[in-house]
Structure formats: C-alpha cells, structure tokens
Amino acid sequence: LVSMIKKGGATMTGWEDILLIQSSESQNEKNIRSEHFNYDPIPFVWNNTWREGREDMIYKFANLGFRTVMSNSSAFYFDMSDNKDFENYGLDWSGYVDYFDAWAIDPLDIFSNKVLNAKHGIDQNYINKTEKIKPENVKNFLGIQSQLWTETVIDNNVFDELFVPNIIVFAEKALSL
C-alpha cells in the first residue's frame, strides 16, 4: 500500500484513530503513536466532544510534527442536532451543536472563547491541563473540514435544514483562517 501511495504521488490521510495507541479506550484513546511511519499520514482530527479530555488532540498531533486537519465533531459536524427537540433531525453524541459553536471556535485556540467555555462548563483549571499548539507547529495545521453524515438525512428538506445554514457559517470560519 505504501509503495502504491508513493508511486502515485498521493498522501495517506485518515481519521485520527489510525494513529492512536490501540487500547480498551478505542476511539476515546488519548495516546498518539509518535512514529510517522514511512508515509507521513495526515490525521483528520474529529473526536473532541467537550469535557471528554480530547479537545486538544489536534494540537497534540501538530506538536508531534503531523500535518493535521481539524474535523471537529462538536462544531463542524452538520448532522448534530442543536437541541433536544425530538422533531429536529440530527444526532447528539457529540453534544448539541448550533451555529454559534462553529462560528465562535478559534481552530488554533479552542478555549479562547469564554462564552463557549461557559456553555460547555469549561473552567480555567480544565484549560490549564490541556495542550496548546506551539507557534513553530502552526505550520502543521492545514485547515478545517466539515462533515454531513447522512444517517438522518431522509430527504432533500432534511438535507437543506442540516446543510445550508451550517455551510454558510462554516465557510465564514474557513475563509477567516
């Protein structure tokens, strides 16, 4: 596989899980394999539900020298519901995500917005225990990516409800980086 990737001039990418230490924690694992292998994969870091201790995973990867893309489930997943209304489409496994979450997040400093921190019960003691991206490693932060998983998209109306407003907010955030 590696020789095919190199021969084709491609770059191996994948969800962050491909570079995590295998353990009973599964997708909640916080320990990263430090080796870059011989194909220098780019992890798309997605699993960062608030208050689960993984909000800073993107910075850990970048500080280890991995080029990374933020695919933040608690801000950039368009299939997350914004509240508990049972008539809303969307899921809630990464919390309730509204437009403000996507707009307010600073991808290079996830805890910089005091309103978001308060909304998610994040205090300074919690923030002090997290990793920050080092200035010399900002170059490893390639950008942000949004997702719309379609388990709950049953027709065009649901697609429009989940996608259209979110993509506008996301585009504003992506263009401002």
What are these regions (language model features)?
Residues 2-177:
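Substrate-binding groove of N-acetylhexosamine-processing glycoside hydrolases
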